[in-house]
């Protein structure tokens, strides 16, 4: 499971007493290279500048966003000599919106940046590189995002409702009604959403809006005050026009306006339908998700008579496809509601060779009832902080093959050190381009017992 992230934040080493640079100050800079998060790096008077929107070799004018010690964070506002790599951003808001940080970089260069980040982490932290590099797993660079959270805030001073996405490094809202990374089905919903919300009777009591595209479209509204009958009519008419489900989140858990409706997505390759609820983790990129599952199963090479373990199983995104191919899948997840949902998904897909367990995967596995029979192979998909306690114990399970899906190359590299200690070798690794137009890196690694 994973884990949406938006870039690294660099902290100074030690307790520097260098005077702080005022926020808003402008500075002319020459960018020396790119950081792993896609920001340009420049050096001025002993300070290191991290500049969003800048490319290596460019001379830019940057506005300071903040500073701490000898580290300055800034945003490029003027480009004096553009890199040959620079391209026009597809979105007019790319410079301010916090959603996309590298739209000015061609997609193949984005992939190269992510590949470099993974390789550097494995080399510097674990001291290894895989026996073979896999080609980047990617899909369309725009129109891929099937889920989005839209920020909504009442501006009391201006007496208007702000609707859009959060600005980079800020709580400000960038007014947006068109987002090129959203799937096409959500574009008209996003276009008309601000005007609809401004018709509601208590705009100051509105929270965020979530948009979903899967087996059906859905719009979820977070509201902090009861909705009037006229509000419900406006919301229902809007959703009916877009053929979308309406979900409301007041007190308690989010609920569909029509209790018979549910959210879900399909894994077409395996003829599977997975149901979920708002708040459950679902990969936002449907195409890359399906390709990721296929690659994980190809690398794991499960045999029909094998017993396979899926750790951090979530809704069953890997466990259910695995169950199509092996004798038994044991799937473990830390969140009890997700365990219940995964078991329901297995039952609704007529899969009876799966067992699901809730467990704290930061604790020893030896006492777990599901760990005593051993496994031929293990798949794990941990959150950003990795799976250090788990990998320390994997050798006791007897698995010969292990596929690790990571949303954080730093913790993958750290855990690789431990897996090598446990007697595994790194056979293959590659990036998963789950979030084009951002510097966020997901990765997959195959380990085999020596």
Curated annotation (Swiss-Prot):
An example Gene Ontology molecular-function term: iron ion binding
Instruction: Tell me the first and last residues of the signal peptide.
Output: none
Instruction: Write out the residues that bind [4Fe-4S] cluster.
Output: 91, 97, 100, 179
User: Sorted alphabetically, which InterPro entries does this protein's record hold?
Assistant: 23S_rRNA_MeTrfase_RlmD, MeTrfase_TrmA_AS, MeTrfase_TrmA_CS, NA-bd_OB-fold, SAM-dependent_MTases_sf, TRAM_dom, U5_MeTrfase_fam
Q: Which reaction does it catalyse?
A: uridine(1939) in 23S rRNA + S-adenosyl-L-methionine = 5-methyluridine(1939) in 23S rRNA + S-adenosyl-L-homocysteine + H(+)
Binding positions (S-adenosyl-L-methionine): 283, 312, 317, 333, 360, 381
Catalytic positions are: 407 (nucleophile)
Tagged with keyword Iron-sulfur:
yes
Q: What is its EC number?
A: 2.1.1.190
Keyword RNA-binding on entry: no
- Keyword line: 4Fe-4S, Iron, Iron-sulfur, Metal-binding, Methyltransferase, rRNA processing, S-adenosyl-L-methionine, Transferase
Q: SUPFAM superfamilies annotated for this entry?
A: Nucleic acid-binding proteins, S-adenosyl-L-methionine-dependent methyltransferases
Q: Provide one Gene Ontology biological process annotation.
A: rRNA base methylation
Annotated stretches, region: Disordered: 1-22
Report the superkingdom from the record.
Answer: Bacteria
Q: HAMAP family, alphabetically?
A: 23SrRNA_methyltr_RlmD
**Family designation:** Belongs to the class I-like SAM-binding methyltransferase superfamily. RNA M5U methyltransferase family. RlmD subfamily.
Q: What is the role of the protein in this entry?
A: Catalyzes the formation of 5-methyl-uridine at position 1939 (m5U1939) in 23S rRNA.
Under which name does UniProt file this protein? 23S rRNA (uracil(1939)-C(5))-methyltransferase RlmD
Give the originating organism: Pseudomonas fluorescens (strain ATCC BAA-477 / NRRL B-23932 / Pf-5)
